[in-house]
C-alpha cells in the first residue's frame, strides 16, 4: 500500500518511495539510497532495498548484473537458479528497465570481495537495472520470501514511478 509516499531525485533519476519504507544512510559511496522494508508478520528479518550508481560508464551491463544477482541465490535442491529466475525487460517512463526475480538461499558476499557470504534460506531477490542517459542505476531488494512478496505491490509502484529528468 502506497500511503504518504515521498519523491526523491538522484542525479536526474526521480522516484516515489512508499512511506512504509524507512530510509537509512547509505553504507558506502556506491550506494545512493537505502531503504528498510518492514518485515511481514511471522518473519524475523526486514527486507532491504538498495539503489546503486557507479557513474555514466560504471557497473557493467544489464545482463552481467542480472547474471551476478542470479548467482547470489542458490536452490535448496541444488538445481540451477538461472532456470528458476524470472527475467523481464520493459520501458518505464521512457527508461529501459531489466528486472530479475528469484527465490532460494541468499548467498551473496557480505561486502564486495569478502570471503564471508550470507546464508539466508527462503529469501527472495528482486532487482532492476534502470538505464538512463547518465548511466545505469541498479536497484536490489532482498529479504525473506514472505516479506518481499508482501512488499511486491509497493515495489512495482516504486519501479513505475522511476523517471529521468
Where are these regions (language model features)?
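Sec-dependent N-terminal signal peptides
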Residues: 1-7
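N-terminal helix-cap/turn-to-beta initiation motif at the start of protein domains
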Residues: 9-16
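Secretory pathway targeting signatures of secreted, lumenal, and periplasmic proteins
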Residues: 16-76
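Signature of long, low-cysteine stretches enriched in small and polar/charged residues
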Residues: 19, 30-32, 66-130
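Surface-exposed amphipathic alpha-helical segments
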Residues: 19-21, 133-165
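Solvent-exposed, acidic/flexible segments
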Residues: 42-44, 58-63, 119-122, 144, ...
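Second-shell loop/turn segments in exported
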Residues: 50-59, 86, 140-149
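Solvent-exposed coil/turn segments that connect beta secondary-structure elements
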Residues: 54-56, 103-107, 134, 144
